[in-house]
């Protein structure tokens, strides 16, 4: 069994619409990854522009596919706000995991006590070079509208974009560990 699932779920027009929605209605996040001393942004780990989307119709379009493709049978109870990532020339996200086994603390509101169980990334365009999504030394995403679904504990990265702009939509399904 592979560590990820990939499938075409959105049309190119739907992807273009998501990009526009994110740029116009998304909530921009200014800072990304801070260094180990929590002082400043560490762009050597991640350099990208981020917009959070909490659009109900977007969840209704994507989540049935996530549920259907969940071959690991994770029991998740919440989905974090979707994140539009804009990677311009030179932008990247170094090797990381989306969940390190430490549950969200009480300051996380409805996510308190939960962990990221399942991660997904949807490629929204192909008009860029570099910027490959890498998981287990495989470059699985290469078509607009493809979703990549994988356990949140698997290491992955986005290589630096060398030309153009890469757009992706990512999300995380959260729940209690070992359920």
Regions found by a protein language model. Give the residues of each.
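Fe(II)/2-oxoglutarate oxygenase catalytic core
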Residues: 1-147, 153-179
């Amino acid at each position: 069994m592979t560590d990820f699932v990939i499938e075409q779920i959105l049309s190119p027009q739907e992807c273009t619409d998501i990009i526009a929605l994110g740029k116009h209605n998304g909530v921009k996040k200014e800072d990304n990854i801070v260094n180990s001393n929590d002082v400043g942004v560490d762009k050597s780990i991640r350099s990208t522009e981020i917009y959070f989307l909490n659009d109900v119709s977007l969840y209704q379009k994507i989540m049935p596919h996530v549920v259907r493709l969940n071959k690991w049978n994770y029991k998740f109870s919440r989905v974090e706000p979707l994140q539009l990532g804009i990677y311009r020339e030179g932008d990247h996200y170094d090797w990381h995991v989306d969940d390190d086994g430490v549950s969200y603390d009480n300051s996380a509101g409805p996510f308190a006590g939960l962990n990221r169980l399942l991660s997904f990334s949807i490629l929204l365009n192909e008009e860029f070079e570099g910027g490959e999504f890498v998981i287990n030394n495989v470059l699985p995403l290469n078509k607009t509208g493809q979703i990549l679904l994988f356990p949140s504990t698997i290491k992955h990265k986005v290589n630096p974009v060398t030309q153009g702009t890469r757009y992706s939509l990512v999300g995380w399904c959260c729940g209690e560990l070992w359920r």
